[in-house]
A protein has these predicted regions:
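Active-site rim helix/loop that mediates acceptor-substrate recognition in acyltransferases
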Residues: 27-70, 74-82
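A short beta-loop-alpha structural element at the N-terminal edge
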Residues: 2-14
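A generic structural signal for residues embedded in beta-strands
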Residues: 316-318
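Conserved acetyl-CoA-binding loop-helix of GNAT-fold acetyltransferases
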Residues: 108-111, 116-132
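Conserved acyl-donor/pantetheine-binding loop and adjacent beta-alpha core of acyl/acetyltransferases
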Residues: 74-108, 173-184
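Extended, composition-driven regions rather than compact fold-specific motifs
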Residues: 56, 69, 75-80, 138-295, ...
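Short beta-strand-centered segments at strand-helix junctions
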Residues: 289-314
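Short, charged beta-turn/beta-strand-edge "cap" motif at the junction between a beta-strand
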Residues: 320-326
Length: 331
């Protein structure tokens, strides 16, 4: 199992993965045409000549035995108009805000059920930061993530059903799909500059506002461990929290090492597992393999070299795997 950038031939496999995802994964709607557009954006961004041309990257967890995608994570450039609510506790209201939290955001983190609790959730999430560090120029000083808010067992959002439905007349599933497929049209046609007093919201909505769905708690914990902090903003649809970090202070980037690799025999037992990525932003790969850092060199087996498509002596970025729980989904 390893991480690589998405390719056009991954469309069918990616669609099958997304089809099984719960409601609320706005950035990857169950629509093959839209998924194809996002894949092609990623392919084009991977080969972009400059950071200004970069729009999106989708990284997939690939199973070479089954020849299928078992997870996906992503980064994307935020639109200049990015609607969300700002929670104003002093005035006890929600204010619609369209100023981007940061120029780049995390998104599209989804791991199939069969590969949870095997360390792949951490690899899938952290690979985005390893990819960021591989780029020749920093995309943004800051980066943020919008986490999935509370959605009940019927895939309905109490936040939206209480607030949005009364204002705009669409149920959560329909409006969530519309935002994912036509974000600009969504902002223009479905949002008005209303201030929403807390008094219009019931106690359940107020209690859940800014809280993550149970399936997303581990993802939030992981981001907090990466030095992401909560903001005063929440998602426009489900009221989920929005967190932000300084790119250079992200723990995976700050604590990783850059060093050359050397091949050792399989008889050399390497007891620690490392998250390792190559330094090729235009042919990015990452894996979770046994390795040992000795005298400034990362000792690996031949399988690791083959997986990363590198030669002995090439430089890699690596970080020792921690034993913390990892999240499985956020948007």
């Amino acid at each position: 199992m390893y991480i690589r950038s998405v390719t056009e031939s991954d469309l069918t496999s990616l669609y099958k993965l997304v089809e099984r995802a719960p409601a609320g994964l706005t950035s990857l709607p169950r629509d093959q045409k839209i998924l194809h557009e996002k894949i092609m954006q990623s392919v084009e961004s991977e080969q972009a000549a400059s950071g200004q041309e970069w729009q999106r990257i989708l990284l997939v967890l690939f199973d070479p035995v089954e020849q299928c995608i078992t997870g996906v994570s992503g980064l994307e450039r935020e639109k200049s108009t990015a609607p969300h609510y700002t929670v104003d506790n002093k005035l006890e209201c929600l204010r619609l805000d369209t100023t981007a939290i940061s120029p780049v955001k995390l998104g599209s983190l989804l791991l199939g059920d069969t590969h949870r609790r095997r360390g792949f959730g951490g690899l899938l999430s952290k690979s985005r930061f390893l990819y960021l560090a591989s780029l020749p120029e920093e995309l943004s000083e800051y980066i943020h993530a919008e986490l999935r808010g509370w959605v009940n067992n019927d895939d309905a959002s109490p936040f939206w059903e209480t607030l949005g439905y009364s204002l705009y007349g669409d149920n959560f599933s329909a409006i969530d799909h519309f935002r994912g497929s036509q974000p600009d049209a969504f902002a223009f046609h479905h949002l008005a500059a209303h201030e929403v007093p807390f008094s219009l919201l019931n106690q359940e909505v107020l209690a859940k506002m800014g809280q993550v769905h149970p399936d997303t708690k581990n993802a939030l914990r992981m981001l907090e461990q990466e030095n992401f902090g909560r903001t005063c903003h929440v998602d426009i649809l489900d009221g989920g929290p929005i967190v932000r970090a300084t790119t250079a202070e992200i723990a995976t980037i700050r604590n990783s090492v850059i060093c050359p690799v050397t091949e050792v025999s399989t008889n050399d037992l390497l007891s620690d597992r490392w998250m390792i990525s190559n330094s090729h932003s235009k042919a990015f790969r990452a894996c979770l393999h046994p390795a040992a850092l000795r005298e400034g060199m990362l000792h690996v087996h031949s399988q690791t070299l083959s997986t990363l498509k590198i030669q002995p002596g090439e430089r890699v970025r690596a970080i020792l795997k921690q034993s913390s729980k990892q999240g499985n989904i956020h948007d």
